Design a protein with these regions (language model features):
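C-terminal substrate/ligand-recognition segments
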Residues: 7, 25-48
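Beta-rich accessory regions
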Residues: 19, 49, 56-139
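Alpha-helical multipass membrane-protein architecture
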Residues: 7-10, 42, 52, 85-90
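Single conserved hydrophobic/aromatic residue that forms the stacking wall/gate
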Residues: 1-13
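A glycine-rich phosphate-binding loop feature that marks nucleotide/adenosyl-phosphate handling sites
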Residues: 14, 28-33, 56-62
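Long, well-ordered core segments of solenoidal/helical folds
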Residues: 14-21
Length: 139
């Protein structure tokens, strides 16, 4: 799916099916997997295939969050211009450098560092749209 379509679906699921009401998580919690998806999605990325180490970008819920890793490392996620209206990724920086992929690898996350999303209120149809910037599919 195009990154713009993924974000729309992710936000629909997050906003409709994860609430603070008694029925806030729909269906079977699936041994914590649905809650894990919600936390990762709130950071702005989530795994579609749990075995390949690829996390596709969505829309961050937080302006800033830190993931504390082993050996004192931290992976910081920042969402600039983040708001209810600004839900579309305009650009991404990984460790201060432009990053054109619409996904990040597990290996990049566990190294520690900084992932910055620059958000806007209209889709950037160019971001992550090129085939080389999309996650590889199983063949």
């Amino acid at each position: 799916l195009h990154p713009r379509v993924r974000r729309q679906r992710q936000m629909c699921i997050r906003d409709r099916f994860y609430t603070d009401q008694p029925e806030g998580i729909i269906g079977n919690e699936d041994c914590g997997q649905m809650s894990a998806w919600h936390i990762m999605s709130a950071l702005g990325f989530y795994q579609v295939n749990p075995s390949n180490g690829v996390f596709v970008f969505g829309s961050p819920l937080f302006d800033k969050a830190s993931v504390h890793l082993p050996e004192g490392k931290t992976f910081e996620v920042v969402a600039q211009n983040n708001s209810k209206e600004n839900v579309y990724i305009q650009s991404v920086l990984l460790n201060g450098k432009p990053y054109n992929n619409s996904y990040i690898l597990y290996d990049d996350i566990v190294k520690g560092g900084n992932l910055t999303f620059v958000m806007g209120n209209t889709p950037n149809k160019e971001f992550g749209a090129a085939p080389e910037n999309r996650p590889k599919t199983a063949e």
